[in-house]
Amino acid sequence: MGIDQKISPFHLAIPVWNLQDCVKFYTGVLGCKTGRSSTHWADMNLFGHQLVLHCKPKTSEKTHANAVDGKQVPVPHFGVLLQWKQFEDFANQLRSKNIEFIIEPYIRFKGSVGEQVTMFFLDPSGNALEFKSFKDPNQIFAKE
């Protein structure tokens, strides 16, 4: 199934230690719309998916990273698959808002099956986000 086909929205709840800062980030930087909320959680519309920010006390736990293509990919991470042009526009929008990338936008598997562009950055609570796009959306799960 390619990303241009109708899929069901996902629901993901993530921990945040400052709800106000994260709501501001997700709405002001990522362009999310808010849904229901309370003093300790808030629903976000993340590209049509339900992302819920839940307050949790800040911990000193460090994010783990795995080496991929010589880069340190944070684990866990989440994000959205975008159309190629949409990804380019979104990356430029993030740059204009001075987002600090963990991994700058770059192309993986150039000219090969599964060619994709990807980028990583953190929200104010340290949650890692990855946004990516496949040159051919029908190759999302292709092996060769």
Please place each PLM-identified region on the residue numbering.
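Core segments of cupin and vicinal oxygen chelate
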Residues: 14-58
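A short local loop/turn or secondary-structure capping micro-motif enriched for an aromatic residue
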Residues: 52-53, 59-63, 137-140
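Alpha-helical elements of the RecA-like P-loop NTPase motor core of helicases
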Residues: 23-24, 88, 129
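Short secondary-structure boundary/capping segments
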Residues: 4, 34, 42-43, 67-70, ...
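Vicinal oxygen chelate
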Residues: 2-5, 8-17, 45, 65-144
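N-terminal beta-strand motif that seeds the catalytic metal site of vicinal oxygen chelate
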Residues: 1-21, 77-78, 82, 133-144
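Active-site/binding-pocket entry motifs
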Residues: 58-59, 100
